[in-house]
């Protein structure tokens, strides 16, 4: 949100505010940022994304090939439901590199949901689940064919019908919600519910994005020039990754400050424990000493992490 400014590139975004339309790509579950590309606010999510994928996906493949050689799953929201983007990702599959699959939220566009609901209701093969009174859900798979694309792909569909809302109010007409997820993951390894669960993890993307805006204070970018703000975003991604690495290495050991168990720590926590430290500059015996103190709760973790970085040639 950069409303109330005349900054270059600020425009009306799909969320209804004046700002930018950044593209953020993260690798793994810890929030390591592969790219934070700044784009004009009026730009559509999928516009120009092919060029971004040409950089991002091979980068993820190289990182995976240098480690556990794990396959890559590209997870995208409905704004990227595009056959051109799928072809671009398919082109990244080559010998010697980790396999690339994708999971994209389907955009129903002009699908007649009421007509589809009537067809499913008339089909005896449809299996409905009833999680509560006045609500039923059905999930099914269907094969998808894209012109010029030979790789098998399927779409997991879910239709939710409500005749009573969550508060017990009877509805005059049924309410339907149609959702879908397009994927190249094989059904024998990932059933429909597994695909839905995999996509639910996409919510962590918003958590990572909020850390840029709050913890790194990038809610409103500093410059009126678009290129300068794009550089700020690139440097912010670098800073984010450094802080992630410090947090993973320094705040999960037995000597880490006592906190609740977690697989990762927020950037704000990493800065509070390892960056914002009281110190004294001491001149003694023709030497200048930086005294960091040894009695605060993160002193041991800080000393251990500093030693590890020094041995690695970073100190």
Question: What residues fall within each predicted segment?
Answer:
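Active-site beta-loop-alpha junctions of metal-dependent nucleic acid enzymes
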Residues: 38-62
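Short, conserved catalytic/metal-binding motifs centered on acidic residues
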Residues: 1, 31, 72-81, 102, ...
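Short amphipathic alpha-helical "interface-anchor" segments enriched in bulky aromatics
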Residues: 192-231, 235, 239-246
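A short, flexible helix-boundary coil/loop motif
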Residues: 243-315
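Acidic, His- and aromatic-enriched active-site or binding-groove loops in soluble protein domains
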Residues: 13-22, 54, 92-111
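Active-site-proximal, Lys/Arg-enriched surface segment
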Residues: 1-25
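Acidic, metal-coordinating catalytic cores used for nucleic-acid/nucleotide bond scission
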Residues: 74-83, 108-110, 227
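An anionic, glycine-rich sequence signature occurring as long contiguous blocks
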Residues: 98-210, 214, 301-315
């Amino acid at each position: 949100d950069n409303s109330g400014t005349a900054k270059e590139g600020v425009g009306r975004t799909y969320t209804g505010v004046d700002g930018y339309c950044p593209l953020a790509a993260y690798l793994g579950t810890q929030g390591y940022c592969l790219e934070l590309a700044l784009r004009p606010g009026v730009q559509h999510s999928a516009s120009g994304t092919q060029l971004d994928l040409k950089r991002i996906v091979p980068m993820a493949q190289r990182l995976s090939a240098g480690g556990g050689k794990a396959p890559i799953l590209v997870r995208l929201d409905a704004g990227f439901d595009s056959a051109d983007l799928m072809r671009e990702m398919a082109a990244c599959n080559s010998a010697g590199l980790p396999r690339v699959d994708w999971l994209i939220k389907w955009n129903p566009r002009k699908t007649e949901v009421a007509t589809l609901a009537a067809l499913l209701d008339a089909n005896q093969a449809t299996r409905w689940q009833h999680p509560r009174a006045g609500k039923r859900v059905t999930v099914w798979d269907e094969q998808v064919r894209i012109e010029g694309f030979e790789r098998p792909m399927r779409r997991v569909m879910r239709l939710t019908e409500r005749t009573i809302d969550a508060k017990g109010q009877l509805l005059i007409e049924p309410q339907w919600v149609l959702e879908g997820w397009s994927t190249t993951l094989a059904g024998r390894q990932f059933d429909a519910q597994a695909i839905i669960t995999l996509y639910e993890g996409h919510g962590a993307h918003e958590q990572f994005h909020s850390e840029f805006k709050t913890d790194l204070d990038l809610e409103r970018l500093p410059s009126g020039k678009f290129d300068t703000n794009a550089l700020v975003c690139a440097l912010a991604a670098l800073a984010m990754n450094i802080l992630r690495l410090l947090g993973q290495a320094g705040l999960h050991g037995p000597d880490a400050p006592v906190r609740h168990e977690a697989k990762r720590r927020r950037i704000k926590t990493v800065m509070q424990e390892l960056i914002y430290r009281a110190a004294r500059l001491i001149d003694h015996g023709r030497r200048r000493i930086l005294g960091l103190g040894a009695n605060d709760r993160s002193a041991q973790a800080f000393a251990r992490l500093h030693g590890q970085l020094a041995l690695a040639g970073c100190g």
